[in-house]
Swiss-Prot record:
Glycans are attached at residues 183, 364, 368, 376. Belongs to the glycosyl hydrolase 17 family. It is an enzyme of class 3 (hydrolase). The gene is eglC. The keyword Secreted applies. It catalyses: Hydrolysis of (1->3)-beta-D-glucosidic linkages in (1->3)-beta-D-glucans. This is Probable glucan endo-1,3-beta-glucosidase eglC. Coiled coil: none annotated. Glucanases play a role in cell expansion during growth, in cell-cell fusion during mating, and in spore release during sporulation. This enzyme may be involved in beta-glucan degradation and also function biosynthetically as a transglycosylase.
Length: 453
């Protein structure tokens, strides 16, 4: 009887431990017009029923604020509740609007209560604010950023806002580029977070070999470097993708064949194993941007522009191993050398044209430095160096002024597979290879319990 109960428990725990998979959703369309609740509902329904997939049932938001308003809660919330879509909430942390963001968060909690709480998988305080605040971000005119100390303060404010509410158990993190994460002067943000969000686009790494055949290696390397400084905290993949159309970036060609290859090589190993929010379901309504990353075209449809099935794709190497993360740490300036600016960014790199569309900007048109938003390919997140480069730290800690030079990245390896049984997580962390939100930890824990009978 004990065995049956434990197996039942395994299934129950596995169900709760399944990694979230979804897309990023801005509060406006590509022409800057605000999305309505029905717009969000249609997108969420489409994502759940995409042909060739098991369904993308999670949504990452950039802001808590409805487009065109100052502090009204975003209408994606009631749409998500109606469509049973989980939410990675976003607090826009640049430009001095945090008070309104938190006000909208509190209003949403009061309005939607327990239904809201059970759909929230996490809260991201900020999106690439550290990159935008770096020397390279300022050079690229990526928009307003935020200092590490400010982000830490905002994280604490959000914790206070959700204490004792239906969202009290929501893990809080921050989303940024890997070069921001490995910059030692930003380590206080890592300390304040429950998880780290990773944004990366090999397509834009145009100062190095970045053909589609290079893409997975570039992606894995940058994730490993992020894991190496994460201090054992989970690294969630909050943005990545490959464009279906648009200009060529060095060796990176935007077309559906390459978008499919990137989906197979990078996406499929992640889906179901690591919390992942892909960029993007649709970005061509009503205007098609250059480049365009949408997996559906200008008309919302459950039939994608390319085959999304992963059945024939290996699920191995969902995230880089702990060994790879440790190696990345040693090659990313872990010795503690200090430099001014990102030493891993290619000197004199050429900049690409900035996209003109607005999907994914902050509330009411403020820039999001990650693609989408104000983009320049000289950004360190696009042009970081390969393994073995020295001195990954030292971006400015203030908006392009006299900011401090940070120390090199510390060589922490990350063990991110979580489960309801901490002892099994520790025992099996090497085998799990750091799979964030994986079924592995839950099932393995039950087998450990069975072995002890």
């Amino acid at each position: 009887m004990q065995t049956r109960q434990l197996l039942a428990l395994a299934l129950a725990v596995a169900a709760t431990e399944a990694a979230h998979q979804g897309f990023n959703y801005g509060n406006t369309k590509s022409d800057g017009s605000a999305k309505s609740q029905s717009d969000f509902a249609a997108e969420f329904s489409t994502a759940k029923n995409l042909v060739g997939t098991s369904g993308f049932t999670s949504a990452r938001l950039y802001t808590m604020i409805q487009g065109g308003t100052s502090a009204t809660p975003i209408s994606a919330i009631p749409a998500a509740i109606a469509e049973d879509t989980s939410l990675l909430l976003g607090i826009w942390a640049s430009g001095g609007n945090v008070a309104n963001e938190i006000a909208a968060l509190k209003a949403a909690i009061a309005q939607y209560g327990a239904d809201f709480g059970k759909h929230v998988v996490g809260i991201s305080v900020g999106s690439e604010d550290l990159y935008r605040n770096s020397v390279d971000g300022v050079k690229s005119k990526a928009g307003l950023g935020a200092n590490p100390d400010d982000l830490v303060s905002y994280i604490h404010q959000v914790r206070e806002a959700i204490a004792g509410t239906s969202l009290s158990g929501a893990p809080i993190g921050h989303v940024d580029t890997w070069t921001a994460w490995v910059n030692g002067s930003n380590s206080a943000v890592i300390d304040a977070c429950d998880w780290l969000g990773f944004d990366g686009y090999p397509y834009f790494q145009n100062t190095m070999p970045n053909s589609i055949s290079d893409a997975k290696a570039l992606f894995d390397e940058s994730v490993a470097k992020t894991q190496a400084v994460a201090k054992g905290k989970e690294v969630w993949i909050t943005e990545t993708g490959w464009p279906v159309s648009g200009k060529t970036e060095n060796l990176a060609v935007a077309n559906t064949a390459n978008a499919k290859a990137y989906w197979d090589q990078v996406g499929c190993p992640l889906f179901g194993n690591t919390n992942t929010w892909w960029y993007i379901l649709q970005d061509a309504d009503p205007v098609t941007p250059n480049p365009s990353f949408g997996i559906v075209g200008s008309t919302l449809s459950t039939t994608p522009l390319f085959d999304l099935s992963c059945s024939a794709v290996s699920s191995s190497s969902a995230v880089p191993s702990a060994t790879a993360a440790a190696t990345a740490a040693s090659g990313a300036g872990a010795s503690g050398s200090q430099t001014s600016g990102f030493a891993t960014a290619a000197a004199g790199s050429s900049s690409a044209a900035k996209p003109t569309f607005s999907v994914g900007k902050g509330p009411n048109g403020s820039y999001n430095g990650t693609y989408p938003g104000s983009w320049n390919s000289t950004r360190p997140g696009a042009n970081g160096g390969s393994s073995g480069s020295s001195g990954s730290s030292g971006s400015s800690g203030s908006s392009g002024s006299s900011g401090s030079s940070g120390s090199g990245a510390s060589g922490h390896s990350s063990s991110t597979g979580s489960s309801s049984f901490p002892s099994s997580t520790n025992l099996l962390s090497n085998s799990a290879s750091g799979l964030s939100g994986s079924l592995f930890g839950a099932v393995a824990a039950v087998f450990v319990a069975l072995a002890a009978l």
